């Protein structure tokens, strides 16, 4: 009975009139509260059919029923820090020069939360933020800086699973649960006479660290308990199709090799990795649920806009990879759901959107004028009354999104233009590495590159991409940045830099022939700068390269 009452109350509250219009800006004390929950590594395709059938996600389903789901939401860079830099700045990656997990925004950069605070909002952040420069391990930095070197070294542990055989163990990711508890306690203490904006960053469902003798543990363990694994429908798990190693795009082969995924995997191994990942997503959903339940108990749900998203997705063995760092759907397609006053219920939006849209949307919710030259666009015109505003939405924003990647585990800067049925992926200088073109309406698994089959479409999309970003120039800048940063680091550690590298994540491969790899680095350092992808010299195996119940426990 309680659940029915809660569902009815929430449904009525969430169908309330829009909190503002374009014609009249609200006073801050009339503005709604905002809660943004951002997880890590969550595949956005799990938030709608058919992906949502594989695992029970009751609170995401609640948001779907009482709010708006964006069916085609994308990260602007499929790796943690650059993606979050885009979300917090509202700018594309090449504009903030957030090239890798070490290089993000300046710590003093003015974010949307800073602006909302200046306009009277109470603000608070808990958990993983990760949008500023200077973080992550030495391994992560050196791997990104040396991706242009002509060698091939495994940088990650082979993906594995680890099960806690306890049907009652709900709190597996302890740190995330602790941050969720802190966020809820803050909600209990906040001054309700003023609007607030709360951010909760979760590390789940990012894979866990794996045992390693290197400087930094690789994060290749999919870890959960029997409690969460029972939320997964094993029969619904799809085993992804793989191209042979010789058929793979050269950048994909490099990524698969550095991620230690070119070896043999049984179908059972692949299915278990995917099942454990989905179980980790279920635990993530439960933390989102604790926030929603707390808002309800505090009589704040009908006054608060709740947003859920993620920095990027998770490959989970699609295209013979785990992690992200790729432009395939599993890596770049993120969840984006919103519910609250003025947001249409049970709406699915097919338009392409991306994380740079968070910045202008947050300010628009608060009735704050948007700064000029943002890369993103507010989503509110579409959310308040989709049928009336969809055409205006399309008129005011372009029908494409941009994603780019410049970090480790890929040996070329990568650029994705997503528009309509098409996904176009360009690399490096646009000439040295073959592009990719996928028709997602016919090839949702992205197994057939039709770039050469449809040269006119490929050319048109490439020209559009170049009108958005001069990607050959950006690639050259990243190449030069990588070289300069590596030289500075090499000088800082002295003549024994090879011994330092020998104890990073790629230590096992490096120690087999350190002289060979030192020579490759020296050749790279003395060669003329070029954004071209490297040609690995190491031989490899294979050819080429109602509100649900709480689950907090």
Swiss-Prot record:
- Show the active-site residues: 80 (nucleophile)
Q: What are the binding positions for Ca(2+) in this chain?
A: 40, 80, 311-312
Its Gene Ontology cellular component terms are: extracellular region; lysosome
**Region annotation Disordered: residue ranges?**
530-553
Needed cofactors, names only, are:
Ca(2+)
- Segment forming the signal sequence: 1-16
Catalytic reaction list:
an aryl sulfate + H2O = a phenol + sulfate + H(+); Hydrolysis of the 2-sulfate groups of the 2-O-sulfo-D-glucuronate residues of chondroitin sulfate, heparin and heparitin sulfate
**Per its UniProt record, what Pfam families does this chain match?**
Sulfatase
Q: Which UniProt keywords apply?
A: Calcium, Glycoprotein, Hydrolase, Lysosome, Metal-binding, Secreted, Signal
Q: Where are the 3-oxoalanine (Cys) modifications?
A: 80
According to the record, cofactor stoichiometry and binding are noted as:
Binds 1 Ca(2+) ion per subunit.
Name recorded for this polypeptide = Arylsulfatase K
Q: Its encoding gene is what?
A: Arsk
């Amino acid at each position: 009975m309680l659940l029915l009452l809660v569902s009815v109350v929430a449904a009525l509250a969430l169908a309330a009139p829009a909190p503002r219009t374009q014609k009249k800006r609200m006073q801050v004390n009339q503005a709604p509260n905002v809660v943004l929950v951002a997880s890590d590594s969550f595949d956005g395709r799990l938030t709608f059919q058919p992906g949502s059938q594989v695992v029970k996600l009751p609170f995401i389903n609640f948001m779907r029923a009482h709010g708006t789901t964006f069916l085609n939401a994308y990260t602007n860079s499929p790796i943690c820090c650059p993606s979050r830099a885009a979300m917090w700045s509202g700018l594309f990656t090449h504009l903030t020069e957030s090239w890798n997990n070490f290089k993000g925004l300046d710590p003093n950069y003015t974010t949307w939360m800073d602006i909302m605070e200046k306009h009277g909002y109470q603000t608070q952040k808990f958990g993983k933020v990760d949008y500023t420069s200077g973080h992550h391990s030495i391994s992560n930095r050196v791997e990104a800086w040396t991706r242009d070197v002509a060698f091939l070294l495994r940088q990650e542990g082979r993906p594995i699973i680890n099960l806690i055989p306890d049907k009652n163990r709900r709190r597996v990711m302890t740190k995330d649960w602790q941050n969720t508890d802190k966020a809820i306690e803050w909600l209990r203490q906040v001054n309700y006479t003023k609007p607030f904006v709360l951010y909760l960053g979760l590390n789940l469902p990012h894979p866990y660290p794996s045992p390693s003798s290197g400087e930094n543990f690789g994060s290749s363990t999919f870890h959960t308990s029997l409690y969460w694994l029972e939320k997964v429908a094993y029969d619904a798990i799809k085993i992804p199709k793989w191209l042979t190693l010789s058929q793979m795009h050269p950048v994909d082969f490099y990524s698969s090799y550095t991620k230690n995924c070119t070896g043999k995997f049984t179908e059972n191994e692949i299915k278990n990795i995917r099942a454990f990942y989905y179980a980790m997503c279920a635990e993530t959903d439960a933390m989102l649920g604790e926030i929603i339940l707390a808002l309800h108990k505090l009589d704040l749900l009908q006054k608060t806009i709740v947003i859920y998203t993620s920095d990027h997705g998770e490959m989970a063995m699609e295209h013979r990879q785990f992690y992200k760092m790729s432009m395939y759907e599993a890596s770049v397609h993120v969840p984006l759901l919103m519910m609250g006053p003025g947001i249409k219920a049970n709406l699915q939006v097919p338009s392409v959107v991306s994380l740079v849209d968070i910045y202008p949307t947050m300010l628009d919710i608060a009735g704050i004028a948007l700064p000029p030259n943002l890369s993103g666009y507010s989503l509110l015109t579409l959310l308040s009354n989709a049928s009336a505003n969809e055409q205006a939405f399309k008129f005011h924003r372009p029908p494409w999104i941009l994603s780019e990647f410049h970090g480790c585990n890929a040996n070329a800067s990568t650029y994705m233009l997503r528009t309509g049925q098409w996904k176009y992926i360009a690399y490096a200088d646009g000439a040295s590495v073959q592009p990719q073109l996928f028709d997602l309406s016919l090839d949702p698994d992205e197994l057939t590159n039709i770039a050469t089959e449809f040269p006119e479409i490929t050319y048109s999309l490439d020209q559009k991409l170049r009108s958005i970003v001069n990607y050959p120039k950006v690639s050259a800048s990243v190449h030069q940045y990588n070289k300069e940063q590596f030289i500075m680091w090499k000088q800082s550690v002295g003549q024994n830099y090879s011994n330092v590298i020998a104890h990073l994540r790629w230590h096992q491969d490096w120690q087999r022939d350190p002289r060979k790899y030192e020579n490759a680095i020296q050749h790279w350092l003395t060669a003329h700068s070029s954004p071209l992808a490297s040609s690995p010299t190491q031989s490899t195996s294979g050819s080429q390269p109602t509100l649900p119940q709480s689950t907090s426990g």
